[in-house]
Amino acid sequence: MVDSMDMANSSQNTFRRRTMATSEMREFLSTKDAEPNNFGMQTIPESPTPSTPTRRMSIGDSTRIYDWEEPRFNIQGFVVDYFTYRIAQNGLDWYDAPALPDGVQKEHEMMRSLGTIFEKRHMEMFENFSEQLLAVPKISFSLYQEVVQTVGNSSNTPCPMSYGRLIGLISFGGMVAAKMMESAELQGQVRNLLMYTSLFIKTRIRQSWKEHNRSWADFMKLGQQMKEDYEKEKDAEEGKRLKSWSIIGASVIAVIVCGRIIFSFK
């Protein structure tokens, strides 16, 4: 009986240390009021952008088709492609990944580039986040859901699914998926990650992109601009600048994970 209690206390203390050990977490928690206006993507403006040309259906001139409504731009395709790409970066294969009916689009490739840039800019934070998020496998997916909801539903951006937030969510999800694929216990949750991330983003695109004049065509233009800017600045000491997404991201992860882990031992 004593041995069982000692083991439980030891496990609880281990997880508490894991969630509180990162000095950056403690520092960022002191700035809870910070909110990411563009998910750390300073080169992507969040003010309304000019409308871009869209196609019309051959039947009924009054029916407008936005590019984000086209089947080849189904958001699940973006998530599948990025998750597959990110998992491959770790030398692994997502053997049961859903197929892409229309193949890899140039927009998917742009998302790969921007997601990679986003992760590089937040590499240390991402590593700390994933360590804490996956500390207790039985609650990893539910923790991921809470993080996505908390960050994705923040209201301080003009567009609920801004380009920066879109890139950040897919990039973060891809990193978590890659980490899950390394664990036999967590591999089966990658598809759950895919479905949840896709539905979350799809819902918000349909709710906001029309009103805020967002489109994949505009995403491509701004994405190219960001890539060019990144090439110019990648040798600069970016680490000296504190990113707003990192601030709220660290706060969200630390609070949610620490609370849930402690609760799981009660």
UniProtKB/Swiss-Prot annotation:
It comes from the Eukaryota. Its main location: other. Residues 1-58 are annotated as: Disordered. The keyword Membrane applies. It holds the Pfam family BH4. It is a peripheral membrane protein. One of its GO terms (biological process) is release of cytochrome c from mitochondria. It is found in: Perikaryon; Synapse; Endomembrane system; Mitochondrion membrane. A motif (BH4) lies at residues 75-94. A motif (BH2) lies at residues 208-223. InterPro entries: Bcl-2-like_sf (IPR036834), Bcl-2_BH1-3 (IPR046371), Bcl-2_fam (IPR026298), Bcl2-like (IPR002475), Bcl2_BH1_motif_CS (IPR020717), Bcl2_BH4 (IPR003093). GO terms for cellular component: endomembrane system; mitochondrial outer membrane; perikaryon; synapse. SUPFAM superfamilies: Bcl-2 inhibitors of programmed cell death (SSF56854). The keyword Membrane applies. Residues 24-35 have a biased composition (Basic and acidic residues). A motif (BH1) lies at residues 156-174. GO terms for molecular function: channel activity. Keywords: Apoptosis, Membrane, Mitochondrion, Synapse. Interacts with asymmetric homodimer ced-4; the interaction sequesters ced-4. Interacts with egl-1; the interaction results in ced-4 release. Interacts with dre-1; the interaction inhibits ced-9 activity, either directly or indirectly. Interacts with dct-1. May form a complex composed of ced-9, ced-4 and mac-1. Plays a major role in programmed cell death (PCD, apoptosis). egl-1 binds to and directly inhibits the activity of ced-9, releasing the cell death activator ced-4 from a ced-9/ced-4 containing protein complex and allowing ced-4 to activate the cell-killing caspase ced-3. During larval development, required for the elimination of transient presynaptic components downstream of egl-1 and upstream of ced-4 and ced-3 apoptotic pathway. Belongs to the Bcl-2 family. This is Apoptosis regulator ced-9. The gene is ced-9.
